[in-house]
Swiss-Prot record:
EC number: 2.4.2.-, 2.4.2.22
Purpose of the protein: Purine salvage pathway enzyme that catalyzes the transfer of the ribosyl-5-phosphate group from 5-phospho-alpha-D-ribose 1-diphosphate (PRPP) to the N9 position of the 6-oxopurines guanine and xanthine to form the corresponding ribonucleotides GMP (guanosine 5'-monophosphate) and XMP (xanthosine 5'-monophosphate), with the release of PPi. To a lesser extent, also acts on hypoxanthine.
A GO CC term attached to the entry: plasma membrane
Designated name of the protein: Xanthine-guanine phosphoribosyltransferase
Organism annotation: Rhodopseudomonas palustris (strain ATCC BAA-98 / CGA009)
Annotated residues for binding of guanine: D111, I154
UniProt membrane topology term: Peripheral membrane protein
Transmembrane segments: none
Domain of life: Bacteria
Cystine pairings recorded for this chain: none
Gene: gpt
UniProt cross-references to InterPro entries, sorted A to Z: PRibTrfase_dom, PRTase-like, Xanthine_Guanine_PRibTrfase
Residues reported in the UniProt entry to bind xanthine: D111, I154
Keyword Magnesium annotated: yes
Amino acid sequence: MTQSEPTEQKRAGRPFPVSWDQFHRDCRALSWRLNELGPFHAVIAITRGGLVPAAIVARELGLRVIDTVCIASYEHDKQGELQVLKGVSDQTATLGGGTGKGLLIIDDLVDTGKTGRMVRSMLPDAHFAAVYAKPKGRPLVDTFITEVSQDTWIFFPWDTGLSFQPPLKDGAG
Ligand SMILES: O=P(O)(O)OC[C@H]1O[C@H](OP(=O)(O)OP(=O)(O)O)[C@H](O)[C@@H]1O
Ligand SMILES: O=c1[nH]c(=O)c2nc[nH]c2[nH]1
Ligand SMILES: [Mg+2]
C-alpha cells in the first residue's frame, strides 16, 4: 500500500462509537439469541476482538470450555494479508467432531467477511456469531445483533477513550 492510499477506517468515513455499556447490552442480546440455538460444547473466540464478546456469552450460557483461533489482518485500521497464528486445539476439534458441529465461534464484527470465511473453512459446521455485521460480511455469520452500513467504522470501547467533542455548529463552543 502506498502512503497516499486511505486506510479502511478513512474509507469507511462514518464513525459508530460503541460504549462498554452498549457493548455489554449487545452481547447479552446475542446471548439470548444463542441460548435458543444451542446447546454448544465450547466457545471459540476469534482473537483479539472476539475475546470480549466470547467472555460475556460464555458467562451467560454457562460455557467453560473456551478456545481461540488467532487471526491477524488489520494493522490498526489497514487490512493486510490474513495470518492464522493459531488454530483450534485438538481437544476442541474433537469436541466438534472434526467439522465444528456444536461449537460456537464468536467475533466482535464481520466487515469484508475475509476473517469469517477463513474460520468457516476451518470449522464448516460450527455456529458463527458476531455482535455487529456489515453487508459484505453478513452472509458469513449465522447470528448477529446489529447491522451497520459498509461505509461505517465501528469504534470499540477498548480502542477508544473519552475526549472533547466540538459542537456541531461552527463556533458554538
Ligand atoms: O470481516 P473482516 O474484513 O475480515 O474484518 C473483521 C475482523 O477484523 C477485526 O479483527 P483484526 O484483524 O483487526 O484483529 P483484532 O481482532 O486483533 O483487532 C475484527 O475483530 C474482525 O475479526
Ligand atoms: O475497530 C474496528 N472497526 C471496524 O469497523 C472494523 N472493520 C474491520 N476491522 C475493524 N476494526
Ligand atoms: Mg478480529
